[in-house]
Amino acid sequence: GPDVRWCGNEAGHCRKAEWSVVPAELRDAERTASKSQQADDGEFSRKIDSQDEDIGSRAVIRNARELVWYPSEVDTSIRTGWFYHPEEDTDVRTADELLDIYLDAVGANASLLLNIPPDTHGRIAAPDCASLAELGTKIQQIFASNVTEKAKITADSAIAQHPITQAVDGMADTYWQAAYGQESDTITLKFPKPQKVSCVVLGEHLPTGQRIESGEIWADGSKAAEFTVVGHKRICRFTPVDVQTLTIKITASRTEPTLRLLEVYQ
């Protein structure tokens, strides 16, 4: 069967909470070719639809007969349409627009398929190249300075086999897990001196399932950001702040939360 799910639109819009565990009927509800690149005229309305804003919350999956692992793919184009037209050379998405889409898709448990049409000579047009190059620079700047190792990290709870240090060891197959029975937890990073921070990246250990539903990031007692699901990756950006104690509060989880990835950037 299909292994990736159309996000439900081709404008780059992403859900607030993008779950990879969804009702199995979505596989048949959204044969992408039959709905993609067509007007939303109501013909495809059904009990659950790929265009619905909520397709994976507890309320939605509670009555599902079967659940499947069906991650989202955000599809959009760098241009107004899917093919090259010279008159659109002045209407290419800017690097800032593309960055917002990247952070909302890749940074919120989805993959991103960005259409970049070749011109009539089989080349990528100069305006597209310029926008993409600037996008690459912006992404590199966000993740240029990883300050995680400067902090001492602790968690309110953990099972012995999976301490919090395994969330920051850079290994793909190790992870932190909260103590059995815990559906919320708090992780604290203490820096030896005030450290400028503007971004936190989280990732769950997906072989044990997508679990985290919501959380908050606090900087020295002030809330810096809120987030919903984590999944493969959650990129949390906020106004740069000088902080000595950074706190990540997992406020709701479907069972004991896990993290295979925790990175803090300046």
Name the predicted role of every residue range.
Residues S184, P192-C199, V243-Q244:
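Extended extracellular/luminal ectodomain segments enriched in beta-structured repeat modules
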Residues P194, F227-V229:
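Hydrophobic transmembrane signal anchors and adjacent membrane-proximal interface regions, especially
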Residues R254-Q266:
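Edge beta-strands of jelly-roll/beta-sandwich modules across compartments, strongly enriched
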